């Protein structure tokens, strides 16, 4: 009998960005206007030269305009837009060039600080360039000297946008059309990190001198309670504290509060920039060592090293009168200060699962 072998996991499947979808649907609609040809698929060239073919759900003409739609395929990435219908409507115009319009489910920029001006549709620079290049090539091929009005839509985009950072960034009414490579890399986290940078940029540009970077909802609630900070000054960093600290080298906001659960703050204290369990773990011997530095005896150190969780280690220290939470925050503060510019004042809060503050260090 043949010995069974464990099945190898299939490689994660990449997808295509909303920018690629907008390019493909704009090209198909414009081609229908200029040539009368309607197809069920269209090929586009991505920024790095790769050619991809995208299936269309429809491509049709309605009076003075044409429209084409495709279903967003994010591959194996847990993208909020996966499966959404993205469609573009194109009209011809006398003036050369491209005029972009935010259609149904696509947001509009309402705050300064982003790469797009206030009032512009939230179609980012690379997707704009992709659309422009493809439509210009089509115009050249057809000897067309006019321009195009391109309206990009996402069915249900206004509701989907509530699951993103757009409302906090001041992008209202729907989603952003994104992408720099045209390809969605599964679990690359690039879009999340970009939203962190955008959040800092928007807060800074709008005159906020104090921001709070938080790992989740409980830490955000704590910062609201302590400082009364508005949404625009709250940066949802998740596990990506490094994205915050490094970006402050470019945009040195004067005051930074870091707030997260005790376990995650202990990882920051140990010098980790990514606090996710895939990339960093809680070092119980290190916690025991820090406890020893502030008076923990050998028995307490052994108990901390044998603890099941960081919260249990914290509880053991608290019961013995050892301020482990403050000590961990002090080490996290020292590491954060080593990354950000000297002019940025930093403080660190550690909280429990109920949002209670269990440690603090820094800025008074």
Curated annotation (Swiss-Prot):
Gene3D superfamilies: CbiD-like (3.30.2110.10). It comes from the Bacteria. Its EC number is 2.1.1.195. Keywords: Cobalamin biosynthesis, Methyltransferase, S-adenosyl-L-methionine, Transferase. It is an enzyme of class 2 (transferase). PANTHER family: COBALT-PRECORRIN-5B C(1)-METHYLTRANSFERASE. This is Cobalt-precorrin-5B C(1)-methyltransferase. It comes from Pseudomonas putida (strain W619). The gene is cbiD.
